[in-house]
Amino acid sequence: MRRVAIVGAGMTPFGEHFELGIKDLVPMAYAEAVANVDKGIQKSEIEAAWFGELSTTDGFPSGILADTLDLTDIPVTRVENACATGNDAVRNGVMAIASGMYDVVLVVGADKVRETSSNTTFWEWAAMTRDNAWDYPLGLVAPANFALHVNRYLHESPATKEHLAMVAVKNHFHALKNPKAQLRYEITVEQALAAPIVVEPFGLYDCTPQSDGAAAVILAAEDVVDRYTDRPVWVRGVGIGMDRVMHQHKQDMTTFPPTVRAAKAAMKMAGVTPKDIDVAEVHDCFTGVELISYEDLGFADRFEAYKIVEGREHYVGGSIPVNPSGGLKAKGHPPGATGVAQCYELFNQLRGEAENQVDGARVALAHNIGGPTAVSAVTILSNEKD
């Protein structure tokens, strides 16, 4: 297979963009991605595009992207894989170039979910990302769904709600330096623990906000990458993992098998181990999910993720900085855009240009998990080709 690199990346601020639609947000992210290509790129050089969008607030996604960006002369494909949509869209673009089909492609992720109340949005998402014969009628919207796992994890491990609060505090702290983050303010452990309960064990500060936003990356084959930059960020590995959809069929509620499978696949393709990862963007839709994911991604042994938190090793400056962007928790979470935005952050990290820079970062990991914990996508990036 041919090697593939990111040569440009861009994203909008994440937040409540009531005045903007998908047709506004997508061009903003695309324009920044094009502007960040060091040696420039012409629209005519883009041969295909993939568009990750979970919702369809503006209608037919792939047609809207083609129309809005004036890319009607190339194939555009919509990708939807619950909250793993963003990194799966990147995976599709990577595979298309690796196969030899194209030399240069565009990957965009976007969603606009703040047009409705949070309660309405939860049910709309659940209808798209749950088993409608079982989980959906039982009311397993996202907080309840993930709470089942995290409650069991807290029961079986030494971790406590204080550790969840410490994850939230860290992500808010990291977001302070990110001008595109939605929640740019600090919180304390005491505030997090005293916040109103959403569903046990999650308080308000354990939950990601719902967000509007878009992100884009431009991918190029190794044969042509020198046309665009002398500082490419290589996509070393990609992986997708799956699991049972209905919760009564899940074997262990204290782990996310899709994450384990996706991480193993991506790391095998990249030729790296968890110890090689210098910085990670982890899918912290809820604080407990970040904690469990430390173990599933191989950063901590079984039931020992709390040690990373207590040692502050997950901060920038620690042994495994996680979510220097602020993560979903504080940066925001437009589902289709989230994974692509993770790649945007890591593109900047690996080029030494991030707002919250991890010194000497060489290898980075992006991670999504979605649906009823039934799908995960992992991408491994590096500023080194091999």
Label each region the model flagged:
Residues 1-84, 153-160, 182-188, 192, ...:
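Conserved active-site "lid/cap" helical segment
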Residues 1-23, 166, 197-261, 265, ...:
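Condensing-enzyme catalytic core mediating Claisen C-C bond formation in acyl metabolism
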Residues 56-65, 247-251, 284-307, 334, ...:
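Short glycine/threonine-rich loop-to-helix capping motif typified by GTGT followed
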